[in-house]
């Protein structure tokens, strides 16, 4: 991203937040109809499914969005190749690329940004952004990160070249890591990645050396940094804390605000659309960016229509988050819809303690990237101060011994990186792993008391 162009485009995007609610609805509707026509003309999948639903091209201009067919991740992956618009994209080649090429921010084929979903609803998927969509998303993300800041204040902040640390799962094609890195580049700031797999003593060393003044990351990971600050292990003079990737509860928000004595921005995004909304305080709710997405809730189910990604149109795509929508009211400071009661994934962190009382954590996303033939799904549960279990669902055609061997190799490496080689790791084979019926998401970490009774094998420790 060109620095000057980024600032000019950001200024234009910020101006849209000053529209009144009526003009925002007109803008959103115009973008929606453009996307519907584009999908009809360029996506084999959408034209076929629209026609199957009895929708004609003439109706694309005025038929309510609720009349259009919905899509979920399963259908999306099954029909990936006929849904995407570019002819040089196919799911098989994307999976080969993901498996063969080490994850970095370089675009696939030099022009596509491939986001690997974290799999909180089951099997991981791939979401593709072309350069135009990626840049639109980055501008929305920058607008959210600097929410409630005037352009003069933003220019003053950026002139000092802020030092930004991103604390999350950085080793993979996770949208957050890729987007944050490109966004920081776009505003000319200094950056440091702090992976959740890094041992705590290394956290302390790197934070002391880098001295960040803006913190971005999972709230569960930022909380650990706040605790290090509270204990006096490190000193952080932050001007802004940006929480993303997990829900941010009111109590944790208060704790982070007090610990860092800084504004806390709660950023909302998903792999399907990395820029969905922003929240500055829990009482007002989450502001949803109606100029970038069209979000519906029907019978408690959320559907997303992304208005800026024309390479991979997502129209009425089911998202497993749970929320209640509240339309912008007359006199509201912003023209956007608000989400009340947003429920998304909020993983527990696994904490372990060695015989000398030294503690170390393992974030669930550090152990979420398992990929091996025959392993269909998995969950984790802590079994003690120095042990945890993995519940594995495998296909009937593979050997349990083969899964054990591969799992042993991968997990030992992860535990070694975190100085957790003393931790015992078990595998439990189960028939099926199902999502939580309340949220529709698969909890990666089972709570205490939630167990499977099945075959158990010690494979590490």
Segments and roles (model prediction):
Residues 1-116, 123-144, 151-154, 159, ...:
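Nucleotide 5′-phosphate-binding alpha/beta core
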Residues 39, 117, 164, 215, ...:
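Residue-level signal for inorganic ion chemistry
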Residues 248-330:
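Conserved AMP-binding/adenylate-forming
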Residues 215, 315-419:
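AMP-binding/adenylate-forming catalytic core of the ANL superfamily
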Residues 195-202, 212-253, 266-272:
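Adenylate-forming
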Residues 130-135, 139-141, 163-221:
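AMP-binding/adenylate-forming
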């Amino acid at each position: 991203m060109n620095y000057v162009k980024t600032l000019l485009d950001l200024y234009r995007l910020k101006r849209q937040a000053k529209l009144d609610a009526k003009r925002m609805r007109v803008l959103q509707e115009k973008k929606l109809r453009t996307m519907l026509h584009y999908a009809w003309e360029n996506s084999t999948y959408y034209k076929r499914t629209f026609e199957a639903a009895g929708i004609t091209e003439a109706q694309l201009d005025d038929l309510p969005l609720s009349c259009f067919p919905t899509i979920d991740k399963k259908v999306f992956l099954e029909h990936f190749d006929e849904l995407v618009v570019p002819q040089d994209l196919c799911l098989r080649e994307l999976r080969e690329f993901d498996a063969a090429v080490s994850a970095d921010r370089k675009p696939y084929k030099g022009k596509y940004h491939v986001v690997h979903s974290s799999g909180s609803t089951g099997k991981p998927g791939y979401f593709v952004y072309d350069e135009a969509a990626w840049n639109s998303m980055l501008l929305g993300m920058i607008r959210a990160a600097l929410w409630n800041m005037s352009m003069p204040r933003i220019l003053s902040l950026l002139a000092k070249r802020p030092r930004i640390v991103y604390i999350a799962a950085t080793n993979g094609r996770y949208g957050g890591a890729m987007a944050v890195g490109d966004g920081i580049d776009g505003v000319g700031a200094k950056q440091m990645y702090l992976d959740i797999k890094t041992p705590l003593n290394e956290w302390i060393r790197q934070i002391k050396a880098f001295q960040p003044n803006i913190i971005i990351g999972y709230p569960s990971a930022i909380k650990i940094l706040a605790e290090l600050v509270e204990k006096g292990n490190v000193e952080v003079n932050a001007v802004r804390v940006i929480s993303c990737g997990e829900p941010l509860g009111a109590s944790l928000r208060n704790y982070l605000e007090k610990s860092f004595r800084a504004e806390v921005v709660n950023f909302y995004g998903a792999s399907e659309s990395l820029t969905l909304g922003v929240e500055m305080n829990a009482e007002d709710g989450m502001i949803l960016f109606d100029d970038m997405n069209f979000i519906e809730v029907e019978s408690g189910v959320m559907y997303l229509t992304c208005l800026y990604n024309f390479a991979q149109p997502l129209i009425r795509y089911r998202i497993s988050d749970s929320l209640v929508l509240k339309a912008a009211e007359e006199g509201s400071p912003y023209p956007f819809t608000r989400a009340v009661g947003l429920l998304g994934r909020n993983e527990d962190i696994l904490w372990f303690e060695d015989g000398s009382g030294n503690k170390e954590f393992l974030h669930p996303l550090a152990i979420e990237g398992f990929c091996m033939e025959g392993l269909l799904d998995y969950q984790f549960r802590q079994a003690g101060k120095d042990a945890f279990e993995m519940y594995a669902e495998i296909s009937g055609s593979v050997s349990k011994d083969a899964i054990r061997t591969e799992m042993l190799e991968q997990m030992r490496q992860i535990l070694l990186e975190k100085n957790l080689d003393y931790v015992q790791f078990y595998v439990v084979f189960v028939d099926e792993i199902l999502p939580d019926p309340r949220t529709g998401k698969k909890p990666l970490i089972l709570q205490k008391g939630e167990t499977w009774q099945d075959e158990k094998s010690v494979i590490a420790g």
